[in-house]
């Protein structure tokens, strides 16, 4: 099954909801970055959230960036998404290995540490929207739940999960974001809270064969659900040699001259997809000619 996101409303539009299966997306990230299991789980959770939060935006050129800045060994996580379901991301230390937590699970919280979650929305305005909250648990889903309530004043339930195979490939990945609208009735909120309390973990549900649609049926049990949209999602990086060339032009003539004087080819790496781009001395001279 290809990865996709569903967008839905429930309870006469008192609730809006998103759910996603992102197994291939997270596995692509794992392969690109050669991440350890705990780094895969942490990055995978944020990629899943990013894909859903990206499609919440309306504009074709809108860009969402999620940054987890913690003092743990993972050395931060960065994810960028657009409004079309395309997402990319990386961790500071992809090789991080720490002991399992008390439940015997991958210790994402321990790898992340204490710090902040930052949400940046670039919607083509003069200044991007920036919201920042302190990390609550470092488990990602709870931190986003807190962000929505504290920074956007939208009561939300966020569930995210990544399950690994024994060979460290990704077995399951996905999640949901369910949000209560300002005009929601008390009984709607109470029923939703009750559902969230009793629901099984995202990875358990995915392992049982649940789709994004049936994930929402679990979270929104007892509500009328209307699926509005189905959006493919994928790990996608828009880097290219010409984009990297533009970055080289932007460093200026002085630095470019110094690189040329060294007489060696230059290798630049894209953080998001780990692709290396090589530029020969001749190519650097050509780039220098393009500099103003």
Explain the meaning of each model-derived region:
Residues 1-229:
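Interaction interfaces in information-processing and related assembly proteins
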Residues 197-292:
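Cys/His-clustered metal-coordination modules, chiefly Zn-binding fingers
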């Amino acid at each position: 099954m290809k990865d996709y996101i569903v967008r839905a409303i429930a309870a006469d539009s008192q609730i809006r909801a998103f759910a996603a299966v992102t197994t291939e997306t997270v596995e692509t990230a794992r392969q690109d970055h050669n991440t350890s299991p705990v780094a895969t789980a942490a990055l995978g959770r944020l990629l899943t959230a990013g894909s859903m939060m990206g499609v919440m935006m309306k504009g074709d050129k809108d860009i969402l960036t999620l940054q987890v800045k913690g003092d743990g060994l993972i050395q931060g996580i960065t994810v960028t998404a657009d409004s079309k379901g395309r997402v990319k991301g990386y961790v500071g230390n992809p090789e991080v290995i720490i002991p399992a937590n008390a439940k015997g699970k991958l210790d994402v919280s321990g790898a992340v540490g204490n710090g902040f979650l930052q949400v940046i929305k670039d919607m083509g305005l003069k200044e991007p929207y920036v919201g920042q909250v302190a990390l609550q648990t470092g488990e990602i889903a709870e931190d986003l739940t807190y962000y929505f309530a504290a920074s956007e004043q939208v009561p939300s339930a966020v569930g995210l999960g990544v399950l690994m195979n024994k060979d460290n490939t990704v077995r399951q990945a996905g999640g949901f974001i369910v949000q209560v609208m300002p005009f929601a009735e008390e009984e709607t909120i109470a029923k939703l809270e009750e559902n969230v309390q009793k629901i099984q973990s995202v990875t358990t549900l995915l392992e049982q064969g649940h789709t994004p649609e049936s994930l929402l049926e679990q979270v929104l049990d007892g509500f009328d659900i209307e699926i509005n949209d189905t959006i493919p999602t994928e790990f996608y990086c828009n880097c290219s040699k010409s984009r990297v060339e533009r970055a080289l032009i932007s460093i200026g003539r002085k630095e470019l001259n110094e690189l040329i004087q060294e007489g060696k080819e230059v290798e630049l790496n894209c953080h998001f997809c780990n692709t290396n781009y090589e530029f020969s001395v001749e190519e650097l001279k050509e780039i220098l000619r393009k500099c103003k």
